[in-house]
Amino acid sequence: VDLTYKLHAPSLETVFNMIPESVLKRQELTAKGEVTLEGTLKGLYGKQQMPEATLHVSINQASAKYADLPYGIDDLTAEFSGYVDFMRHKPSYADLKIFRFKGAHTDILADGKVEDLLGDPDITFHTRSEIDLTALAKTFPLQEGVSIGGRVGADFRLHCRLSTIQKQDWGRVRLKGKLDMQDMFLRDTKKNFEFTSQAALRFIGEDNLAAHMNIRKASLRNAAISANL
């Protein structure tokens, strides 16, 4: 197999139309900016043989606004690349070089990388963001029963293995920075899900994870779990 593919979408409208209607309602959308998706499949394909795959996604200074909603996306820029070797001759990875979202009183900047993707993923993630969930709820046409609100401020850097999280071995998590949640809530009445939080978290994790937490209120409820702090 030696295949190269490329999809050029003229705007975010094409991308948003790929999102299942169970998540976003179909509604008139005005969008600008370019979206490019390209990659390759190379190598042997057959019994106990799988080709290598690459993927590169680029969104360049895109903007969008749904009709009849007060807020829109002023600027969305993102670049993502990935490589997967199913035969594991070479290490696989996923690399988010940049994700930048501006609009609706929200400014999100993030980057991250996952190495050893098919083994024990080694995760690195950094974000510096101010998120107004109340305004975002007036940016996207959420389905009936889904509601979000409050504010989230995040400025932290994370490094850990996936197995560390699965084993809840928090001492091996490298996490440094802060996470603030003010009157935050996520609800989906159709799925009987609710999460609310009013908390300020500070993390110090150069060698071992340490944290200072001021949790004024936190609750999680769904069909299987009910917890309050």
Predicted regions located by residue number:
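Membrane-proximal interfacial segments on either side of biological membranes
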Residues: V1-D95, T106-N214, N228-L229
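Short beta-strand segments that buttress and anchor functional surface loops
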Residues: L96-G103, N214-L220
